[in-house]
Amino acid sequence: MTIMRKTHPLLKIINHSFIDLPAPSNISSWWNFGSLLGICLMIQILTGLFLAMHYTSDTATAFSSVTHICRDVNYGWLIRYLHANGASMFFICMFIHVGRGIYYGSYMLSETWNIGIILLLTTMATAFVGYVLPWGQMSFWGATVITNLLSAIPYIGTSLVEWIWGGFSVDKATLTRFFAFHFILPFIITAFVLVHLLFLHETGSNNPSGLNSNSDKIPFHPYYTIKDLLGVIFLLMVLMILVLFFPDVLGDPDNYTPANPLNTPAHIKPEWYFLFAYAILRSIPNKLGGVLALVLSILILATFPLLKSSKQHGLMYRPITQTLYWVFISNLLILTWIGGQPVEYPFTTIGQIASISYFTIIVILMPIANMIENNILKLYY
């Protein structure tokens, strides 16, 4: 008798995606992060759903409703901190996932890569509107500063900002619509994830060697389900250590003060996962130029398939580009650090150098390194 999972219309889809899926036999633990992102998304949707049951999206009661969740709701503190720190874990996994894609040349699966960029942008939008909801000082001023950047768009900028605010400042209408966006966006992300997987399963996964692995495939289950399970256990362990021992280490103390439009915090800054882009934004003195650099800092990922001219796939056997890659990662960490520092010397200068380096490495140095490596290959082969 034929196994039900292979014949049932619904189970058949799950079977082809997670059980009998042919996967390369040599993919390393760097390929675990896709499944970890799926787990993070499920944690965020579930904890978010329970938080939404008790949260009120009104400027008068938003802050106190979050306090009520932490103090009066059974395990409300746990749900709230799981949600807040779950977002940080989500971004850590996402940055590693993108970094692995760049290192091993996964961007050559262009449809999957481009949907991934859309997913990254959508997740960043979701996290931004979510950060506004507790209605603390940093929530309010973060929302004011970031949405106000749209006023840099010529001609329609000011009208666009007022349209998003629902008035002449960040107020009740803004909070209500941000809550609506924050609720719906994770489901849009889930839909994009399915499209991401659809495109991935059309071509099959990349692998560390960068060679075609069609001649050497193994079933996803049990091999990679067990391997992924180890990653999931490790992820949950780190998340629970964060939640139970250091719940506020990644947050901002200013957000424990209710929003006050009459009092500006000393240093307005977003959550840590946006600091690299924020540093790039601040390093350009012109407002419109800063906004363009901010957007390009993410959209530049789309240029990777276009700028690749190397004969080899991935950076495994390309020492020059490999060195540039790690310089790029170090540069990202410097930008993240600078984004959290006040706007004064020497931080502004370091930020400007790091911002120029960020774009130079991708657009100029990596393509040059590709050409050099190709010429070295020609000499020996």
From Swiss-Prot:
Q: A Pfam family this protein belongs to?
A: Cytochrom_B_C
Gene3D superfamilies in UniProt:
Cytochrome Bc1 Complex, Chain C
What positions does the entry give for a ubiquinone binding?
201
* Superkingdom, taxonomy of origin: Eukaryota
UniProt keywords, alphabetically = Electron transport, Heme, Iron, Membrane, Metal-binding, Mitochondrion, Mitochondrion inner membrane, Respiratory chain, Transmembrane, Transmembrane helix, Transport, Ubiquinone
Which GO annotations describe the biological process of this protein? mitochondrial electron transport, ubiquinol to cytochrome c
List positions binding heme b b566: 97, 196
Q: PROSITE patterns, alphabetically?
A: CYTB_CTER, CYTB_NTER
* Cofactor: binding details: Binds 2 heme b groups non-covalently.
Q: Which cofactor does it need?
A: heme b
Q: Name one GO cellular component term.
A: respiratory chain complex III
A single GO molecular function term of this UniProt record: ubiquinol-cytochrome-c reductase activity
Identify its membrane topology class.
Multi-pass membrane protein
Tell me the InterPro entries matching this sequence: Cyt_b/b6_C (IPR005798), Cyt_b/b6_C_sf (IPR036150), Cyt_b/b6_N (IPR005797), Cytb/b6-like_sf (IPR027387), Cytochrome_b (IPR030689), Cytochrome_b_C_euk/bac (IPR048260), Cytochrome_b_N_euk/bac (IPR048259), Di-haem_cyt_TM (IPR016174)
The principal location of this protein is mitochondrion
Which cellular compartments is it found in? Answer: Mitochondrion inner membrane
The protein's job, in short, is: Component of the ubiquinol-cytochrome c reductase complex (complex III or cytochrome b-c1 complex) that is part of the mitochondrial respiratory chain. The b-c1 complex mediates electron transfer from ubiquinol to cytochrome c. Contributes to the generation of a proton gradient across the mitochondrial membrane that is then used for ATP synthesis.
Family, as annotated: Belongs to the cytochrome b family.
Tell me what else is known.
Heme 1 (or BL or b562) is low-potential and absorbs at about 562 nm, and heme 2 (or BH or b566) is high-potential and absorbs at about 566 nm.
Q: What is the protein's name according to its record?
A: Cytochrome b
**Which species does the entry assign this protein to?**
Abrothrix andina (Andean Altiplano mouse)
Q: Coding gene?
A: MT-CYB
